[in-house]
């Protein structure tokens, strides 16, 4: 990598000297002749540079040249586009299956940059757990968060800053706090089911159909805001302002998608090239969004007894660790991280149940045997959701199996902070490291020959007692390092709100299955994954629903 930088520095230096040379040529004839010579020279330099990057360095100089290497997909850009493909994990899974390896696969990205894909539990454990702070988030991700949120957030911080921030953010994310919010999650799940019941419309064949994805997004957004900002947000005028502004910058339109991609990978001046005024709109909306959250928090702080609040925002504020800017930025970051991944996880679990009616029926029978029907409709607040939902083995099995096969974030990547090693192989500073939950969660090494199959029964059964109805949190994975099941990653940088997300999905799935029998509206539809940050069904999830009779 050092030799590459040296070569590039020489290239830029030569180009600068040529430019200076041209500026100091006075006669037209000399200028024309010299320009031709210079252009030929530059062309030769570019050709040599390409040969060096594409052939000489990777084959004869790179310290990673002895590792199993994927054949280049395209000249000079390699597997670079795979970072933006809708089904990001599938290409890496093909790579891991096709190339014999012992935990590391080398592949090339844009401009022949070297990347590593981790495939073994030992390699993943080394990067995510043992030496997690030796591998940092990409610069583009930090630029994206800083640009939108205005201050450093937990997800983009590194080293001591990350450790200290997580230490002071952790208290409201422990299991006891989540159990307090379970009743709220259940209440939101019941309201979502009510909305679904009201929204189903007759199709041309008089079949009741609705897009569950839309309802999931709205319900998750409502639940996340309630968990973050407390009950007061429900009736606050700031709620609608925050929702409106958040939608304006995360609405998913083509220009917003282009904006975030360019923010992450290109200089800021390129943002002004996007037509339609998206740069000014995002800047203005981001500023107004931060101001609205700040104003709401100031109101809360001024209330008597606010220090007794159990919502996340006030607990973080009362820690006295975060500045006002950091508090606002981290709360908005938690909103971004909590909405789409949770909604996407729920939708994928629902999709699997729609195409596997036998498991849908098993979940429904389990619910009927353990939960009175009135808790699904008339009396949701009296239901002890935490203790009951977490104790249902089949419900937990289908949730975990859906997350295993369709993790909301199918790939994640890190950058080597300095020269280091992985599994004893030298890795230069700046090398991009890819961890793919999509690959690990479907690895035959971890899950056996049925790794690619939907089989919630793998999460059921206790080998010691022989009881088949007991929930098995390992799912029968042949690894004890947790690296075979990575829907929320692992180690110090594991998603801080993972137990919140799982509790919410559990409640939403239970309520949906308890209220409706459902199947795909179009049984021939091929479900395609889509999304830059989160993987979700392209075009939503349209289901045909029938209300479940009272029991």
Curated annotation (Swiss-Prot):
Annotated GO molecular function terms are:
heme binding; iron ion binding; monooxygenase activity; oxidoreductase activity, acting on paired donors, with incorporation or reduction of molecular oxygen
Write down the glycosylated positions: 24, 174, 218, 283, 307, 441
> Record's GO cellular component, any one?
membrane
Task: Give the E.C. number(s).
Answer: 1.-.-.-
Q: Which domain of life is it from?
A: Eukaryota
Q: What's a Pfam family in this record?
A: p450
Q: Where in the cell is it found?
A: Membrane
Primary subcellular site in the record, as a coarse category = membrane
Stimuli inducing this protein: Expression is induced during the early biotrophic stage of development. Expression is positively regulated by the ABA cluster-specific transcription regulator abl7.
Q: Which SUPFAM superfamilies match?
A: Cytochrome P450
Which keywords are on file for this protein?
A: Glycoprotein, Heme, Iron, Membrane, Metal-binding, Monooxygenase, Oxidoreductase, Transmembrane, Transmembrane helix
Q: Where are the transmembrane segments?
A: 37-57
State what protein this is by name. Answer: Cytochrome P450 monooxygenase abl5
Q: Which organism is it from?
A: Leptosphaeria maculans (strain JN3 / isolate v23.1.3 / race Av1-4-5-6-7-8)
